[in-house]
UniProtKB/Swiss-Prot annotation:
Classification of source organism: Eukaryota, Metazoa, Chordata, Craniata, Vertebrata
Localization (cell): Endoplasmic reticulum membrane; Mitochondrion membrane
Protein name per the record: 3 beta-hydroxysteroid dehydrogenase/Delta 5-->4-isomerase
Pathway this chain belongs to: Lipid metabolism; steroid biosynthesis
GO MF annotation: an example: oxidoreductase activity, acting on the CH-OH group of donors, NAD or NADP as acceptor
InterPro entries on file: 3Beta_OHSteriod_DH/Estase (IPR002225), Lipid_A_modif_metabolic_enz (IPR050177), NAD(P)-bd_dom_sf (IPR036291)
Record keywords: Endoplasmic reticulum, Isomerase, Membrane, Mitochondrion, Multifunctional enzyme, NAD, Oxidoreductase, Steroidogenesis, Transmembrane, Transmembrane helix
Active site: 155
Record-level GO cellular component terms: cytoplasm; intracellular membrane-bounded organelle; mitochondrial membrane; smooth endoplasmic reticulum membrane
SUPFAM superfamilies in the cross-refs: NAD(P)-binding Rossmann-fold domains
UniProt topology in membrane: Single-pass membrane protein
Record gene name: HSD3B
């Protein structure tokens, strides 16, 4: 197969970096373009280490900048679109989330048509499927069951619209007469080294004498390791570039999980961190129903204050539901169509994440020493 190139949007992020680390090993790949709003110095340093393997071009730009997207897509064979604003606490303005996640995706699809990019892989999220109620139990859910989020909260709503746009664009005619092939991947909650959520959670615990907050003990979910999600993107890319596999994959979405045990978010956090002296808060937590209605009251207060004051409650009904539902999904369709098998076992993923958390603990101790002296 002739030489090809790939654009990864949001490539400086948690998942994007892992995708790029796997991409460099792909056969006949001549260039990786990485588009992000800004690249942190440590990310630039990591990418510089890959320059000896492949041409790696870093592009700083806005997903809403049409000229930027046009230039980034020109001469590209594949687009992997991971860029998005992730916000479950409603801390980011709704307009910002809708613009980046929906309009940005639409503009990128249009840029692909103009630049005749034939393959588009979209990083969606499990949140486009729900959960809609903490009372509803979904175990080993499958794609054909058509679960769909009913939330109007900006993050799940915007990701749902973005995914629909991507799958709806499948089959579009490209400027050169070719055809655009698309698919979407819906990963579960992603954990692993560099996770911004896990990092914030652990830093919060470090500032609380190593006590982990206990707000998600009623959940039962199947988190997925970041390395396995990245691997699923590589397999989707290969499949959409294979004329024999395209007919079954184009316009489809896939749940991406792995063999991480089904457990609560609290249990996952504790398992990954207990080696470093962390412990779960032993205090009683509020019943879910009470948490839910308290969140509803806080949302009403936020709404009433909105004309004169911007008040963001520390939690909301969507977050309470997300954190306390039985909501697990199977990866059998990805296994069948993409040939997906987890690249990392649970033991490997657990060990790598534990070691990273250990490095956070070490950094925290060094910071405290510096403050004392």
């Amino acid at each position: 197969m002739a030489g090809w190139s790939c654009l990864v949007t949001g490539g400086g992020g948690f998942l994007g970096q892992r995708i790029i680390c796997l991409l460099v090993e792909e056969k006949d790949l001549q260039e990786i373009r990485v588009l992000d709003k800004v690249f942190r110095p440590e990310v630039r340093e990591e990418f510089s280490k890959l320059q000896s393997k492949i041409k790696l071009t870093l592009l700083e730009g806005d997903i809403l900048d049409e000229q930027c997207l046009k230039g980034a897509c020109q001469g590209t064979s594949v687009v992997i679109h991971t860029a998005s604003v992730i916000d479950v606490r409603n801390a980011v303005p709704r307009e910002t989330i809708m613009n980046v996640n929906v309009k940005g995706t639409q503009l990128l699809l249009e840029a692909c048509v103009q630049a005749s990019v034939p393959v588009f892989i979209h990083t969606s999220t499990i949140e486009v499927a729900g959960p809609n109620s903490y009372r509803e139990i979904i175990q080993d859910g499958r794609e054909e069951e058509h679960h769909e989020s009913a939330w109007s909260s900006p993050y799940p709503y915007s990701k749902k619209l973005a995914e629909k746009a991507v799958l709806g664009a499948n089959g579009w005619a490209l400027k050169n007469g070719g055809t655009l092939y698309t698919c979407a991947l819906r990963p579960m909650y992603i954990y692993g080294e560099g996770s911004p959520f896990l990092s914030a959670y652990m830093h919060g615990a470090l500032n609380n004498n190593g006590i982990l907050t206990n707000h998600c003990k009623f959940s039962r979910v199947n988190p997925v390791y970041v390395g396995n999600v990245a691997w699923a993107h590589i397999l989707a890319l290969r499949a959409l570039r294979d004329p024999k596999k395209v007919p079954n994959i184009q316009g489809q979405f896939y749940y991406i999980s792995d063999d991480t045990p089904h457990q609560s978010y609290d249990d996952l956090n504790y398992t990954l961190s207990k080696e470093w002296g962390f412990c779960l808060d032993s205090r009683m937590s509020l019943p879910i129903s009470l948490q839910y209605w308290l969140a509803f009251l806080l949302e009403i207060v936020s709404f009433l204050l909105s004309p004169i004051y911007k008040y963001n409650p520390c939690f909301n009904r969507h977050l309470v539901t997300l954190s306390n539902s039985v909501f697990t999904f199977s990866y059998k369709k990805a296994q069948r169509d993409l040939g997906y098998e987890p690249l990392y076992t649970w033991e490997e993923a657990k060990q790598k994440t534990k070691e990273w958390i250990g490095s956070l603990v070490k950094q925290h101790k060094e910071t405290l020493k510096t403050k004392i002296h």
